């Protein structure tokens, strides 16, 4: 004899009264009782792609709505073995663009049904400590805007943890990566300045343990050597305001004169350099000295600075990182070759560098536009 399932609305009214008397939260068991189905059927209704009939789904969703039921993410993760949480590792001192990055990542990861759990590093050398914290959480994957070693990558592989490196690269092995071409950016900046007649360069470096800063400096130094120009005077920096003034004074002391151009590891350092040049040393920028930064942070565009700099396409890079990681997670153990998605920096022609097209004999008549503005180094996936 077939039993008729109870009316969902009637059952919900009675059951809500019971829950109120017991002063407890609604569970999937309550939804199952009201809908007249098993608790496992309720669980399947809240699992994307699970097999469930239209009739059962309709009853469960109606019961859940009437009971104000909110699925327990932690309990669901025990069943699906997916937490729908992505860990994001960020070296907090490395780049003032990273608050923008975090917002973009949260948006794009959220659009794919997942949430972000943030881990910050005071310095990139703190990776071991932070990873020890990450392993304590049941995350589905990691986006790391921090420097990882081959040993760290091996640990990700051992744990079968999906990983995407953001704005970092690892030469020793292939890893899923989304990055700006910082080596090319350094070359581009030197090419622009050299084309306008600059000969003597100083570099105020970024954080010593930052691979981004190292790649930018390497690209700039390589390009100067290719053009037959003197090697730059390089002084250390901390990607902060104070490094700009200290670096400018150190470069002038080492050279015995004001250089033609100073390339700074960050915009904040460049702003410190500008303020020192203009207000402490009486150097006219850009007539006597050109100053360039990196990253195009908000303050670099303020009227009092209008900094010559390079901008990373952070929104597009964040979208690519979210898409790549979620694709790897959804692959469910399938094997695919790691991807490397490379983006080009955008040159921002501000008011702190002399950039008239001199094209002297140092560059030579045979140099084409691609050589002046970059190096044309091949990248596995170049995204303009």
Predicted regions and their residues:
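Alpha-helical recognition/docking segments in bacterial nutrient-uptake
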Residues: 1-9, 14, 19-23, 85-191, ...
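Short acidic/polar active-site loop segments enriched in Thr and Asp
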Residues: 38, 140, 199-200, 230, ...
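Short beta-strand segments enriched in small/hydrophobic residues
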Residues: 39-44, 78-94, 200-207
């Amino acid at each position: 004899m077939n039993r008729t399932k109870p009316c969902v609305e009637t059952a919900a009214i009675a059951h809500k009264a019971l829950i109120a008397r017991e002063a407890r939260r609604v569970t999937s068991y309550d939804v199952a009782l009201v809908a007249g189905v098993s608790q496992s059927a309720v669980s399947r209704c809240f699992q994307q792609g699970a097999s469930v009939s239209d009739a059962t789904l309709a009853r469960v969703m109606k019961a859940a709505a009437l009971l104000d039921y909110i699925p327990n993410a932690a309990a669901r993760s025990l069943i699906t073995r997916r937490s729908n949480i992505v860990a994001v590792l960020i070296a907090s001192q490395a780049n003032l663009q990273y608050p923008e990055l975090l917002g973009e990542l949260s948006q794009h990861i959220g659009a794919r049904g997942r949430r972000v759990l943030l881990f910050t590093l005071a310095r990139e050398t703190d990776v071991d400590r932070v990873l020890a914290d990450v392993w304590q959480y049941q995350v589905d994957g990691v986006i790391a805007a921090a420097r990882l070693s081959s040993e760290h990558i091996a640990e990700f592989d051992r744990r079968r943890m999906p990983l995407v490196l953001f704005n970092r690269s690892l030469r020793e092995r292939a890893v899923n990566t989304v990055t700006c071409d910082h080596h090319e950016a350094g070359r581009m900046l030197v090419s622009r300045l050299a084309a306008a007649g600059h000969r003597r360069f100083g570099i105020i470096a970024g954080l010593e343990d930052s691979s981004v800063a190292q790649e930018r400096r390497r690209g700039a130094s390589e390009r100067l050597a290719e053009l037959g120009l003197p090697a730059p005077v390089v002084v250390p920096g901390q990607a902060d305001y104070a490094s700009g003034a200290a670096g400018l004074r150190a470069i002038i002391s080492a050279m015995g004169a004001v250089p033609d151009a100073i390339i700074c590891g960050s915009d904040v350092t460049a702003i410190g350099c500008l303020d020192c040049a203009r207000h402490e040393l009486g150097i006219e920028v850009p007539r006597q000295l050109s100053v360039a930064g990196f990253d195009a942070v908000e303050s670099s565009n303020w009227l009092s600075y209008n900094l010559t700099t390079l901008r990373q396409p952070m929104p597009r890079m964040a979208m690519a990182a979210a898409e790549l990681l979620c694709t790897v997670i959804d692959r469910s153990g399938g094997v695919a070759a790691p991807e490397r998605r490379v983006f080009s920096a955008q040159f921002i022609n501000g008011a702190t560098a002399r950039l008239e097209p001199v094209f002297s004999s140092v560059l030579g008549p045979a140099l084409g536009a691609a050589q002046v503005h970059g190096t044309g180094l091949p990248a596995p996936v170049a995204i303009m």
